[in-house]
């Protein structure tokens, strides 16, 4: 543990006592001691982080964010602080115009520092196949001959990213449906759609490997470009009747193998889910499938996040007991399925063409907290 200036052992003793109070839930006492430590040595980044965690557990979110910011000023290359501040801003921050921008900047710096040295993912066959195809694409498109961290152009565009032509119809359907499940076609403008595709093709952000056959990109992996921040802004402007005061709280993207399975039955920890697909239609060899199945039953109260996200068999058993009915929305490029996040859903069976740019890609944006 870092020694704090002052009497020998004083800092270490205070930090140990503060940590013990925190672990025991004595948050007021922990806060007092961490502030004492920072009075002795204000440049101790770890103490600012610990104070931030105490403040968050007390429900003092903005003060917690300020403490994380102070820690980052002291240690701007600390990946743990970058991750924590990025997450706090995205998941818990208020309706500040710069919240997403600051969060994404933290995540991008985290990704560059964490993955900049290169290194590939797991050795699962579908991962190896994907990485080989992506490296070929990077060589052809950017002249890259070896595997290393790379982000394609993800800057904002001059045009509006979201096509608002269907907004009125979609909002009316949303307000009249029970359960709330709607489809919005032509979600993004053509320029935004094409640029988002190229960002997903050209960025080595696909860091999580799932045995079913798909890969995941998260904000902390680099799925945090200014274009996505612009899409969020334009989405909230186009669909206030659906999103209301709900803010973007998390996002991810999935990239699939051409024939293997997709995401199993689960629900999302948010209020409104925007799930949209960006791969071109001619890549889909089974146009009546490849989309999303959504059930008309929501997660019961008292279920933990791990139960409704990580337990496909348990979710299916619950749906069977509830006599749930499902609808399957076929895949279409630039189609969004928008639904109440607590509804169970899963990826439909799929069959896409082989080839790197034919891989099915979907983005999920989660709004609000529940």
Predicted regions and their residues:
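Fe(II)/2-oxoglutarate oxygenase catalytic core
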Residues: 91-336, 342-370
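Register position in tetratricopeptide repeats
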Residues: 23-24, 57-58, 91
């Amino acid at each position: 543990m870092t020694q704090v200036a002052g009497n020998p052992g004083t800092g270490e003793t205070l930090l140990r006592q503060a940590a013990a109070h925190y672990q025991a839930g004595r948050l007021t006492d922990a806060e007092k001691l961490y502030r004492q430590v920072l009075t002795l040595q204000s440049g101790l980044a770890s103490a600012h982080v610990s104070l931030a965690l105490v403040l968050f557990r007390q429900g003092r979110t903005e003060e917690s964010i300020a403490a994380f910011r102070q820690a980052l000023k002291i240690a701007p290359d600390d990946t743990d602080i970058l991750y924590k501040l990025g997450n706090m801003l995205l998941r818990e921050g208020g309706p500040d115009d710069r919240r997403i921008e600051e969060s994404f900047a933290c995540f991008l710096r985290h990704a560059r520092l964490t993955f900049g040295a290169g290194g590939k993912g797991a050795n699962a066959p579908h991962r190896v196949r994907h990485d080989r195809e992506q490296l070929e694409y990077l060589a052809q498109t950017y002249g890259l001959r070896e595997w290393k961290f790379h982000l394609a152009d993800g800057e904002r565009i001059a045009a509006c990213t979201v096509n608002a032509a269907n907004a009125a119809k979609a909002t009316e359907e949303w307000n009249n449906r029970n359960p709330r499940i709607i489809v919005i076609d032509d979600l993004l403008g053509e320029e935004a759609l094409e640029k988002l595709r190229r960002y997903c093709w050209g960025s080595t952000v696909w860091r999580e490997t799932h045995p079913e056959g798909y890969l995941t990109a998260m904000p902390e992996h680099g799925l945090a470009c200014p274009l996505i921040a612009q899409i969020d802004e334009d989405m909230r402007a186009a669909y206030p009747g659906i999103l209301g005061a709900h803010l973007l709280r998390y996002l991810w993207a999935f990239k699939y193998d051409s024939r293997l399975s997709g995401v199993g039955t689960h629900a999302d920890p948010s209020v409104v889910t925007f799930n949209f697909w960006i791969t071109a239609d001619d890549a889909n060899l089974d146009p009546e499938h490849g989309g999303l199945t959504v059930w008309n039953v929501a997660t019961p109260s008292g279920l933990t996040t791990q139960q409704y996200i990580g337990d496909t068999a348990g979710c299916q058993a619950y749906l069977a007991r509830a006599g749930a009915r499902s609808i399957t929305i076929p895949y279409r490029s630039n189609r969004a399925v928008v639904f109440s996040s607590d509804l169970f859903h899963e990826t439909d069976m799929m069959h896409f063409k082989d080839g790197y740019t034919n891989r099915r890609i979907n983005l999920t944006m989660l709004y609000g907290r529940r």
